Amino acid sequence: MSGSIDTLALKEEDVTKFLACASHLGANNVDFQMEQYVYKRRPDGTSIINVRKTWEKVLLAARAIAAIENPADICVISARPYGQRAVLKFAHYTGATPIAGRFTPGTFTNQIQTAFREPRLLVVTDPYTDHQPVTEASYVNIPVIALTNTDSPLKYVDIAIPCNNKSIHSVGLMWWMLAREVLRLRGTISREVPWEVMVDLFFYRDPEEAEKEAQAEQAAAEKDKAPKEEFTADQAFTAPGTEVSDWASEVPVAPVPILAGGVDAATTEDWSVPAQSDWTAPAANPANAAAAGAPAPAPAAATTTESWGGSGAENWG
């Protein structure tokens, strides 16, 4: 299909993406209508899908999607959790109407219910899991595009894109490539420049891991928004010093001089009173002496005692 046009030819980088996401690996069982897309079979029974035919079907499906004038008339569905994020991203970039999760029976056929829709084109992730919308689409003549594995039933499927629709990365890659080709056909993006949207955005993410990452980002944002203490001129600043364990060894202590007058000279309040050296004599009262107008009596000189109560006889007998 795209062999004669170099612009639509399969690029080496796209083949690398197919192989990295294991989009070429099918199931062990092969439906009789999917045999034309099987390239070979491995010794363990796994079928190998021809990626060139996968690419051609991606281009065909993109042309069918781009032919719809109103993008909201395109309904993309995924009941499997692995394809719900990819469906929402595809609808975000192309303007389609997503139905992620459980499909309410009667959405396409029951005109009484609130969620009634009349789409012009239906794109599903797995025709086996999404059998209810595929069956209802056959009742109201809605064409169906589906990502099909080697064991997927092709009943009521108009355009089958052979790929591994059981792998997380393969499902995200196929929706990413389909969205990129639709935007290229519409002229929104150029074929000369790579699409700035990463394929990782279409991959399924565990809700618990996503919640942990959101909490970590919120904590980091709150930490950055916290007011920081600003230093002002009135604020005192103390430089950090070394810790001293023994303060007595660091502080010099001056020696205390011993006064010649004894304790009384150091503790008396009247410094005109001379120091008292004879502790047997009564202390003079400076207050009475000052009242009488007489000078204070001089302290008596200490007498030396020569006799200690014994005789000087030399006879000890």
Swiss-Prot record:
What is the protein name for this chain? Small ribosomal subunit protein uS2
Keyword vocabulary terms for this entry: Cytoplasm, Ribonucleoprotein, Ribosomal protein
Q: Organism, per UniProt?
A: Urechis caupo (Innkeeper worm)
Q: Major place of localization?
A: cytoplasm
What GO cellular-component annotations does this UniProt entry give? cytosolic small ribosomal subunit
Q: Does the keyword Ribonucleoprotein apply?
A: yes
Q: What does this protein do?
A: Required for the assembly and/or stability of the 40S ribosomal subunit. Required for the processing of the 20S rRNA-precursor to mature 18S rRNA in a late step of the maturation of 40S ribosomal subunits.
Please list the GO terms describing molecular function.
structural constituent of ribosome
Ribosomal protein: present as a keyword of the record? yes
**Family assignment from sequence similarity:** Belongs to the universal ribosomal protein uS2 family.
How this chain assembles, per its entry, is:
Component of the small ribosomal subunit. Mature ribosomes consist of a small (40S) and a large (60S) subunit. The 40S subunit contains about 33 different proteins and 1 molecule of RNA (18S). The 60S subunit contains about 49 different proteins and 3 molecules of RNA (28S, 5.8S and 5S). Interacts with ribosomal protein S21.
Region (Disordered) residue spans: 277-317
Give one Pfam family.
Ribosomal_S2
